């Protein structure tokens, strides 16, 4: 199933879990989609001054364009039938059967159904990963000493068993042509509220993928030595910083650093190829947007060429929040900067604005940019481009993932074999 369900010059409809798929025989699980927009504790208003007026118009136009295109496609498919030509957007995307543990897709009037399986496995609640006391002691000790470089190559076999202390703050690579399962010793996964339902922590490591697990503030030298000695310099760097956020800080979903200075210290110029692109995911807070544009890109000697938008929608095709809300927006921004050498070689390859429309699933998980990066470099989708993902929480073939949780969404519970 392709992850891009519709695309034109200014927008696309993407299936987020499928965009992260690394093997055609290993299917992504997904959460039940939100059916109705979230209500915010404020009055609905069309007065959106200083709240992304330009973006509001952009996302609404993109959403309307996608709806119209899908309806026309459905009408073409139904021309030879006696069925009604009036097709709702929710019939084209998907519906949630709230009484079951799977998502059932509406097939009667939905032309996109041919790209879906009839049933997708749904992981209703994200698993909780816990480490044994010995592992926690190892982590505490390792965090007190400077990491020393070691490049670990996982040999081709079905399952490899390693301890956390063996891979932490090291560069690990699967250089084989197929995915490998990594059993992480000393850790367990709780799949329900009770600890009685536990299982081993087993993670998929995609073919030719690499990762560095550790704080970016402490392991930058590990990355640079890996690129210098074993890995190709990335042509694209994707950064998804844990921006300070009150609700996230309260939930303790992941570590948030309120001091943004560490972002300036990221070794972007040392890591990026001369004709390179840097894409930074950012919240809608003006302070952080300006920090990326005026501080980070300036320090990294990059030119801002594009601002993309990821519009989050419900299963019925509505924005997740009121687009006019001054409290919260149903989108996030992707700020794209390029080197001067990139501009001279690949001029006009990145649209100045673009809207990615999709149904979100697990907390803060972003759609993969892999379907778009090949276009930025004017190459085929099958060509292997070296990419570095900083603060990433999943692995991609031919990419390097660097951060505290590079294996999070690679746990086997987030995937299911088609056999």
UniProtKB/Swiss-Prot annotation:
- What is one process in the GO biological process aspect for this record? mRNA processing
Q: Which PROSITE patterns match?
A: MT_A70, N6_MTASE
**InterPro entries noted in UniProt:** MT-A70-like, SAM-dependent_MTases_sf
Which key words tag this protein in UniProt? Cytoplasm
Look up keyword Cytoplasm and say if it applies. Answer: yes
Q: What is this protein called?
A: Uncharacterized protein C22G7.07c
- Compartments where found: Cytoplasm
Molecular functions per Gene Ontology: methyltransferase activity; mRNA m(6)A methyltransferase activity
Identify its protein family. Answer: Belongs to the MT-A70-like family.
Question: Species name for this entry?
Answer: Schizosaccharomyces pombe (strain 972 / ATCC 24843)
**An example Gene Ontology cellular component term from the record?**
cytosol
């Amino acid at each position: 199933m392709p992850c891009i369900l519709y695309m034109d010059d200014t927008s696309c409809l993407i299936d987020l879990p499928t965009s992260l798929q690394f093997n055609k025989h290993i299917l992504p699980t997904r959460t039940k989609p939100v059916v109705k927009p979230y209500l915010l504790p404020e009055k609905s208003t069309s007065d959106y001054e200083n709240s992304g007026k330009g973006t509001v118009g952009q996302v609404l136009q993109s959403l309307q364009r996608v709806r119209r295109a899908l309806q026309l496609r459905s009408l073409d498919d139904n021309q030879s039938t006696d069925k009604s030509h009036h097709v709702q957007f929710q019939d084209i995307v998907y519906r949630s059967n709230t009484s079951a543990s799977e998502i059932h897709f509406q097939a009667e009037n939905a032309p996109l159904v041919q790209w879906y399986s009839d049933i997708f496995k749904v992981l209703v609640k994200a698993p909780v990963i816990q480490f044994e006391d010995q592992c926690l002691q190892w982590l505490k000790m390792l965090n007190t000493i400077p990491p020393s470089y070691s490049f670990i190559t996982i040999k081709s076999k079905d399952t490899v068993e390693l301890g956390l202390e063996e891979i932490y703050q090291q560069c690990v690579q699967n250089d084989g042509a197929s995915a490998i399962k990594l059993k992480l010793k000393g850790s367990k996964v709780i799949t329900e509220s009770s600890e009685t339902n536990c299982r081993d922590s087993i993670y998929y490591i995609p073919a030719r993928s690499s990762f560095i697990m550790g704080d970016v503030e402490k392991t930058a030298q590990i990355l640079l030595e890996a690129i210098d000695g074993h890995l190709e310099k990335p042509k694209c760097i994707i950064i998804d910083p844990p921006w300070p956020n009150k609700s996230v800080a309260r939930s303790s979903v992941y570590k948030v650093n309120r001091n943004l200075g560490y972002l300036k210290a990221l070794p972007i110029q040392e890591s990026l190829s001369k004709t390179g692109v840097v894409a930074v995911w950012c919240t809608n807070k003006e302070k952080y947007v300006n920090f990326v544009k005026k501080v980070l890109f300036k320090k990294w000697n990059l030119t801002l060429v594009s601002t993309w938008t990821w519009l989050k929608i419900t299963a019925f095709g509505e924005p997740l929040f009121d687009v006019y809300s001054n409290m919260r927006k149903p989108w996030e921004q992707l700020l794209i900067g390029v080197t001067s050498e990139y501009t001279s070689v690949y001029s006009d390859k990145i649209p100045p604005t673009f809207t990615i429309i999709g149904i979100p699933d697990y907390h803060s998980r972003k759609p993969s940019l892999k379907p778009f990066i090949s276009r930025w470099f004017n190459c085929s989708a099958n060509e292997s481009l070296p990419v570095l993902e900083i603060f990433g929480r999943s692995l991609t073939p031919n990419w390097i993932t660097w951060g505290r949780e590079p294996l999070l969404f690679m746990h086997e519970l987030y995937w299911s074999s088609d056999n």
